[in-house]
Amino acid sequence: MAIIADPKTGKTYKKEIPAERMGSLVGRKIGDEIDGVFFDLVGYKLVVTGGSSIDGFPMRSDLQTQGKKQILVSYKKGYRGKNGIRKRITVRGSIIGSDISQINLKIVQYGPTPLEEKKDDQQA
């Protein structure tokens, strides 16, 4: 599943990714630009901003791996404890693998038709 954020309107849209297209996204990283044709959005350019795995672990942009890692974090992305307290949490790397169930995307270039006019989109 892809969650596409529209920065102009502040709305998000859900798109299901077919299995044959998901294989072409494997190996992309957080921050990579993807053509909107993957999601039937002709003319759009999207940037990967994150995601989560089948197990529910979030992707983290500073880990250059596909697998899970246990890292020690303080008050930052993935842990919101009190200041000075650190905790070991499990996160996914920044590379999209076959076990990623949700990909978060942001629109950076708009196409000729607005997302609101797409009939098969669902608002998240």
UniProtKB/Swiss-Prot annotation:
Belongs to the eukaryotic ribosomal protein eS6 family. InterPro entries: Ribosomal_eS6, Ribosomal_eS6_arc. Coiled coil: none annotated. One of its GO terms (molecular function) is structural constituent of ribosome. GO terms for biological process: translation. The lineage of its organism: Archaea, Methanobacteriati, Thermoplasmatota, Thermoplasmata, Thermoplasmatales. HAMAP family: Ribosomal_eS6 (MF_00512). GO terms for cellular component: ribonucleoprotein complex; ribosome. This is Small ribosomal subunit protein eS6. It comes from Thermoplasma acidophilum (strain ATCC 25905 / DSM 1728 / JCM 9062 / NBRC 15155 / AMRC-C165).
